[in-house]
Swiss-Prot record:
Belongs to the histidinol dehydrogenase family. Catalyzes the sequential NAD-dependent oxidations of L-histidinol to L-histidinaldehyde and then to L-histidine. This is Histidinol dehydrogenase. Keywords: Amino-acid biosynthesis, Histidine biosynthesis, Metal-binding, NAD, Oxidoreductase, Zinc. The gene is hisD. PROSITE patterns: HISOL_DEHYDROGENASE. SUPFAM superfamilies: ALDH-like (SSF53720). InterPro entries: Ald_DH/histidinol_DH, Histidinol_DH_CS, Histidinol_DH_monofunct, Hstdl_DH. Zn(2+) binds at residues 256, 259, 358, 417. GO terms for molecular function: histidinol dehydrogenase activity; NAD binding; zinc ion binding. Substrate binds at residues 234, 256, 259, 325, 358, 412, 417. GO terms for biological process: L-histidine biosynthetic process.
């Protein structure tokens, strides 16, 4: 892992280059995704079967997971896993319940009523990755906010594999309250949820993380359905001063690096000695890490330690990066919170490591990446509702303001708009 001594602008340029390298998308991948989406839209289940055999090596007769298979799954999971899942569910619910909002009813003045109605989405599709790891935690993080919002039907898709779906995923889905589960993955699953097929119902919104093909497919179908966000590779920035613990920092950087070779792990510190210790500690921990090959590639390609003169400059640099995860291993981290403008999720102090947020604390782990924390937010209850405004005016209330409306409409050249107001107050013949 490279230790970099640069001024602010050079450091920022280097970080941007790291991110750009992590987000390079080959044109052939985009073309492949577009073709998959088009074929699923046109051929439905036939295309799903073809791509499932091609990419997953599995021939599936029935895409939907039976209730019997869901029930059997509990026989193959450990009690300790169930206890952990239930604790996570409790915390996720208690946190997200506080995000719920009420409809608004405003009697602005005599004869005027206006407001906003908040209603849940009717159908939501949740993508749960398979790939190199299984993510029961993603089931809870994506499904529970939707349930709290009041979504009527939640459909889950997850890639098939020999021997069936991981029972831990099925148990998590049952605990969270998923209504239907289908064994499809990749871009073809996203297309199926967006357009519907003979077997897969069309949904109103698709949420959940996935690989590059999934992310590009979500971008492709956005507008046909809504999506949560287009997630890039995982990323973490750790800001540390001389009080930082090198073992903790190295472990936290590797916790993101093990996700994906394209993940980004960056440490920004004011202390050169700590930087050297973190570098050595990363090498030491990599030796025993089960997913060391992935993590090492990520660290070598997209990892770095930056030396800066002050924590203020470290925070400025982090704000320019707008990372998915930001850890503050500094004195009085709570005091620095006010200066963090852009980050998906912020972890304060040495005993609030990123995996705490990933699994158990309650805040959502579906977070904006690739600098989009400047304008996107973590997944929340708000993502599963829609809002409609309403208004009511009496004849007298409209009469009082008619001249303003006519003036504005005529100024914009929309004379039928003006006429729609004027006609209500003309003398009837």
């Amino acid at each position: 892992m490279e230790i970099v001594f640069e001024d602010f602008q050079k450091a920022l340029s280097k970080i941007k280059l790291l991110r750009e390298n992590a987000n390079i998308i080959e044109e052939t991948v985009q073309r492949n995704v577009s073709e998959i989406v088009r074929n699923v839209r046109e051929s439905g289940d036939e295309a799903l079967s073809f791509y499932t055999k091609k990419f997953d090596g599995v021939k599936i007769k029935e895409f939907r997971v039976s209730e019997e298979e869901e029930k059997r799954a509990s026989m193959f999971v450990e009690n300790s896993f169930l206890e952990a899942l239930q604790e996570a569910k409790k915390n996720i619910i208690s946190y997200h319940e506080k995000q719920k909002r009420q409809s608004m009813f405003d009697c602005a003045s005599e004869g005027i009523i206006r407001g906003q109605i908040i209603r849940p989405l009717e159908n939501v599709g949740v993508y749960v990755p398979g790939g190199t790891a299984s993510y029961p935690s993603s089931v809870l993080m994506n499904v529970l906010p939707a349930k709290l919002a009041g979504v009527k039907k939640i459909v889950m898709v997850t890639p098939p594999r020999e021997g069936g779906i991981d029972p831990h995923i099925l148990v998590a889905a049952s605990l969270a309250g998923v209504d239907e589960i289908y064994t499809i993955g990749g871009a073809q699953a996203i297309a199926a949820l967006a357009y519907g097929t003979e077997s897969i119902p069309k949904v109103d919104k698709i949420v959940g993380p996935g690989n590059l093909y999934v992310a590009l497919a979500k971008r492709e179908v956005y507008g046909i359905v809504n999506i949560d966000m287009i997630a890039g590779p995982s990323e973490i920035v750790v800001i540390a001063d001389e009080t930082g613990n090198a073992k903790y920092i190295a472990a936290d950087l590797l916790s993101q690096a093990e996700h994906d070779e394209r993940a980004t792990a960056i440490c920004i510190t004011t202390n050169i000695e700590l930087a050297k210790k973190v570098e050595k500690e990363i090498e030491r921990q990599l030796e025993t890490l089960p997913r060391s090959e992935i993590a090492r590639e990520s660290i070598n390609r997209n990892g770095a330690i930056f030396i800066v003169p002050s924590i203020d400059e470290a925070l400025q640099l982090s704000n320019e990066i707008a990372p998915e995860h930001l850890e503050l291993h500094i004195k009085e981290p709570m005091n620095a919170l006010a200066y963090v403008k852009h980050a998906g999720s912020i972890f304060l102090g040495p005993y609030a490591p990123e995996p705490l947020g990933d699994y158990l604390a309650g805040p959502n782990h579906v977070l904006p990446t690739s600098g989009t924390a400047r304008f996107f937010s973590p997944l929340s209850v708000d993502d599963f509702v829609k809002k409609s405004s309403f208004l009511s005016y009496t004849e007298e209330a409209l009469r009082d303001v008619q001249h303003h409306i006519v003036e504005l409409a005529n100024k914009e050249g929309l004379h039928a708009h003006a006429r729609a107001i004027q006609i209500r107050f003309e003398e009837e013949e």
